[in-house]
Curated annotation (Swiss-Prot):
It comes from Drosophila sechellia (Fruit fly). Disulfide bonds: none annotated. The keyword Ion transport does not apply. This is Protein CLP1 homolog. The keyword Nucleus applies.
C-alpha cells in the first residue's frame, strides 16, 4: 500500500490513470491540472477537486494527454496504455449513426444491450455510452436488468431512468423519477418465470415511453444485464433481447457467449465482441454482499454529501397488507384443472407476519389490490422491517416517508435483508 500526500501524474494520449481504495475512512482527492480527461465518459473540470472514498475503483482516461494531481491513500495506483476506450468510443459512433437515421425517419433509436459474465465492466460500459450520448445532445433511456448489483434502484428490482445530463464524477447518474419493478430476489434463478415477466413488462412500458418525446425516441435505450450467462441465465438474455427488440449486443470478454448469440439472435442484430478493461477488478461474494448492503443503506440514509433522514413507525398486523409473488411449487397432480406449474411462480400470496420477517426489505407497490396486475405495476419505493412484536401484533418499519403508509398500501416481500445499525 502506498500513502500519497500529493503527486502529479502525466498521462500521454490514449492512456488512463487507475487507482483503487480499499481502506475504510480513506479518501483520495483528484484534480485536472492541464489537458483534457474523463471518468467513464464524464469530462473532468480543470482545477476542480474530486473526492473518492472506500470501494472506489477509478480509471481516468485522456484522448489527448493531461496532467492529474492526486493525493491520499490508495491501495493501487498506476498508468496504463492498454485500454479499450478507443473501441468503446467506436461503439458510441456506431450507435450515433443509428440515432441520426432514426431522427431523419422518425423511428426508434438504437436499443443496445451490454452482456458478459460477472466483473467485466458491463455497468461501466453502459455509463460510458450513456455519457457520450448525452454529450452530443441525446436523451437516452437506461434500463438496468441486473437484480444482483443494480445501479438505479436497490437489488431485487429492475429499473429504467431517463438520462438528461452526464453522470456526476463522484456519484454517478441522477436517479430522478425512476421506473422500478419489484422482483424480490438477488438472482433471476430465484424465480425465472417471474423475472421474465417483469422484464417483459418493463420493456413494454419503456418502449411505449419512447413515443412521449421525439429526442428520446431517436436516442434509444442502453440496457445493462446480469452476469449469469450460462444455461437459464443465457435464456434470460435472449428473452430480454427479444422483449426490447435489441438491434445491437455488446459482448464483453467472452467469445463463447459471443458465438452463441451470433447463432441464436436474428441476423439483423449486430453482435460485437469487446475486450474488458485491464482495470476491472473481480469481486468476492463478500464484496458483492457489501455493495448490495451499501446500496440499501444509501437508499434510506443517503451519503456524506447528501444525507437522508428516514422515519421509523409502527404498523399493526391488521393494517399490514403484505404479499409475496410466487407460491411454493405443487406437483402437477395437485394443480387445478388448466393451471400449469409456472402459474404458481407468478401467483400473489398473502404473507403472515412472523419474527422471520425482521430485517427484510419490502416494496411498496402502486397496485391498490391483489386483483390488479401486481407484477406489471411499478413500485413507489421501499421500506425495511426493523422489529416484529408478536405480543403487540405490530411491526416497526424504516421508511423514507413519514407515517402513515398510503391508503390501501400493498407491500411486497423480498428476500433482501438490511441490518439497520445506522447511528
Amino acid at each position: 500500500m502506498s500513502e500519497d500526500h500529493g503527486k502529479d501524474y502525466t498521462l500521454e494520449s490514449d492512456s488512463e490513470l487507475r487507482f483503487e481504495i480499499e481502506q475504510k475512512d480513506a479518501k483520495v482527492l483528484v484534480s485536472l491540472v492541464s489537458g483534457f480527461a474523463e471518468l467513464f465518459g464524464t469530462e473532468l473540470v480543470k482545477k476542480k477537486q474530486y473526492e473518492f472514498g472506500v470501494g472506489a475503483k477509478v480509471a481516468i482516461f485522456t484522448y489527448q494527454g493531461c496532467v492529474l494531481h492526486v493525493s491520499g491513500k490508495m491501495d493501487v495506483c498506476y498508468i496504463s496504455k492498454e485500454t479499450p476506450m478507443v473501441q468503446y468510443v467506436n461503439c458510441h459512433a456506431a450507435l450515433e449513426q443509428f440515432r441520426m437515421e432514426a431522427e431523419e425517419k422518425d423511428r426508434y433509436g438504437p436499443v443496445a444491450m451490454v452482456v458478459g459474465p460477472m466483473d467485466v465492466g458491463k455497468s461501466t460500459l453502459c455509463r460510458i455510452l450513456l455519457n457520450y450520448a448525452v454529450r452530443v445532445g441525446r436523451r437516452p433511456l437506461y434500463a438496468d436488468l441486473d437484480v444482483g448489483q443494480g445501479s438505479i434502484a436497490i437489488s431485487g428490482s429492475v429499473a429504467t431512468i431517463l438520462i438528461e445530463r452526464p453522470a456526476n464524477v463522484e456519484e454517478g447518474f441522477a436517479k430522478t423519477a425512476p421506473l422500478v419493478y419489484h422482483f424480490g430476489h438477488k438472482s433471476p434463478s430465484g424465480n425465472s418465470v417471474l423475472y421474465n415477466a417483469v422484464v417483459s413488462k418493463m420493456a413494454e412500458v419503456t418502449l411505449q415511453s419512447l413515443n412521449s418525446n421525439k429526442r428520446t425516441k431517436s436516442s434509444g435505450i442502453i440496457i445493462n444485464t446480469c452476469g449469469w450467462v450460462k444455461g437459464s441465465g443465457y435464456a434470460h438474455l435472449l428473452h430480454a433481447a427479444k422483449a426490447y427488440g435489441a438491434c445491437a449486443i455488446f459482448v464483453l470478454d467472452q467469445e463463447r457467449l459471443y458465438n452463441e448469440l451470433l447463432r441464436d439472435v436474428p441476423k439483423e442484430v449486430h453482435v460485437v465482441l469487446l475486450p474488458k478493461s485491464g482495470g476491472v477488478v473481480e469481486r468476492s461474494k463478500e464484496l458483492r454482499h457489501e455493495a448490495r448492503d451499501q446500496r440499501i443503506k444509501e437508499y434510506f440514509y443517503g451519503n456524506a454529501r447528501a444525507p437522508f433522514y428516514p422515519f421509523s413507525f409502527e404498523v399493526k398486523f391488521q393494517d399490514l397488507r403484505l404479499y409475496k409473488i410466487g407460491a411454493p411449487p405443487l406437483p402437477d397432480s395437485c394443480m387445478p384443472i388448466g393451471m400449469k406449474a409456472e402459474d404458481n411462480k407468478t401467483k400473489v400470496v398473502a404473507v403472515t407476519p412472523t419474527p422471520a420477517l425482521i430485517h427484510h426489505v419490502l416494496a411498496l407497490s402502486f397496485a391498490e389490490s391483489v386483483e390488479d396486475d401486481v407484477i406489471g405495476t411499478n413500485v413507489a419505493g421501499f421500506c425495511c422491517v426493523t422489529e416484529v412484536d408478536m405480543e403487540r401484533q405490530a411491526v416497526m418499519l424504516l421508511s423514507p416517508q413519514p407515517r402513515p403508509l398510503p391508503p390501501n398500501a400493498l407491500l411486497l416481500w423480498s428476500e433482501l435483508q438490511f441490518m439497520d445499525n445506522h447511528t
